[in-house]
Design a protein with these regions (language model features):
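N-terminal membrane-targeting/anchoring modules of bacterial envelope and secretion proteins
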Residues: 1-12
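Secretory pathway targeting signatures of secreted, lumenal, and periplasmic proteins
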Residues: 16-67, 191-192, 196, 205, ...
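Surface-exposed amphipathic alpha-helical segments
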Residues: 30, 123-169
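Canonical SH2 domain fold
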Residues: 33-34, 45-48, 57-59, 95-97, ...
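Short amphipathic alpha-helical segments
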Residues: 64-72, 136-140
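Signature of long, low-cysteine stretches enriched in small and polar/charged residues
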Residues: 72-116
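Acidic-leaning, charged glycine-interspersed low-complexity segments
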Residues: 82-101, 152-174
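Short, highly charged C-terminal tails/helix-capping segments
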Residues: 157-200
Length: 215
C-alpha cells in the first residue's frame, strides 16, 4: 500500500472513513482535520494527528503512462536548498526543514505513484524523522498511510491537479455511514509543490475519531 480501489487484495473498507478520492483507515486516538476551499466548499485534503506527530494527505492526478513522484521530488530539491533526499520505507523520501515560529523543524515528504494518481504525505513531529529509524509514532503513521485506499475516478484531470474529495462519511457498526461537517480555509493549494501552512483548529466534533473544522 497505499492501495488502488481496484486492487485485488484491497483492505476491507467497511471500517474506513470515506472522503471519495481517498479512504482512510480508522485509528483509535487520532485527531482528523479537514481542509476546504472557501468559495466552492471543496474538500482539499486531510491532516491526521496522533500524539505528537501529524501527516497531511492529498491525492493528485497523474498521466496514464508514468508516475509523477520522481519529478515532484526533483522540483522540491531544486526549489529548496535545505531539502535532502533519503531512502525510507516508501522509497525515495524528502526531508524538508520548515520554519515554525522561531525555530526550524523537519518535515518528511513521501509520494506513492498509483494508476493515474499520486498520493502525497507530509509527516511532521516525531514521525518526520528517518523512517528507517522510526519511533513508535512513525511506525504507526507509516502503517496508517500505507493502508490508505485511493479512488481516482474516471474524470479527466491534468497531471498534478488535486483529485476531488467529498465530505467525510464515517462508518458505524455496519456499512451505514455517518457524516461530519468540516470548515473552510481561504485559497486553493497550487498542488504538491505548494507551501504547507498551519491551520487553526476551530471546532471538535464527537462522532468517531476527533474531527475538527479548520479555517
Amino acid at each position: 500500500g497505499p492501495w488502488n480501489i481496484s486492487d485485488e487484495k484491497v483492505p476491507d473498507l467497511s471500517t474506513y472513513i470515506d472522503f471519495g478520492a481517498i479512504r482512510i483507515p480508522y485509528l483509535q486516538g487520532i485527531e482528523l482535520r479537514v481542509k476546504k476551499q472557501r468559495e466552492s466548499n471543496q474538500v482539499l485534503g486531510i491532516t491526521v494527528t496522533y500524539r505528537s506527530s501529524s501527516v497531511e494527505v492529498e491525492a493528485f492526478a497523474a498521466p496514464k503512462t508514468e508516475g509523477i513522484w520522481s519529478e515532484v521530488r526533483a522540483d522540491l530539491l531544486k526549489g529548496n536548498s535545505d531539502a535532502r533526499e533519503v531512502n525510507g520505507v516508501f522509497g525515495k523520501e524528502i526531508i524538508l526543514p520548515v520554519k515554525v515560529e522561531d525555530k526550524t523543524v523537519d518535515t518528511r515528504i513521501v509520494g506513492v505513484d498509483g494508476p493515474r494518481w499520486m498520493l502525497r504525505g507530509v509527516f511532521s513531529g516525531v514521525a518526520a524523522g528517518d523512517s528507517k529509524k522510526a519511533s513508535d509514532e512513525a511506525v504507526l503513521l507509516n502503517k496508517w498511510f500505507s493502508d490508505i485506499v485511493v479512488d481516482r475516478g474516471s474524470e479527466p484531470l491534468a497531471p498534478r491537479d488535486m483529485i476531488p474529495m467529498h465530505d467525510v462519511s464515517v462508518p458505524r457498526d455496519s456499512d451505514n455511514g455517518g457524516s461530519g461537517d468540516s470548515g473552510e480555509i481561504p485559497g486553493r493549494p497550487k498542488g504538491p509543490l505548494g507551501a504547507d501552512q498551519q491551520v487553526e483548529v476551530k471546532t471538535t466534533l464527537t462522532r468517531g475519531p476527533m474531527f475538527s473544522e479548520v479555517r
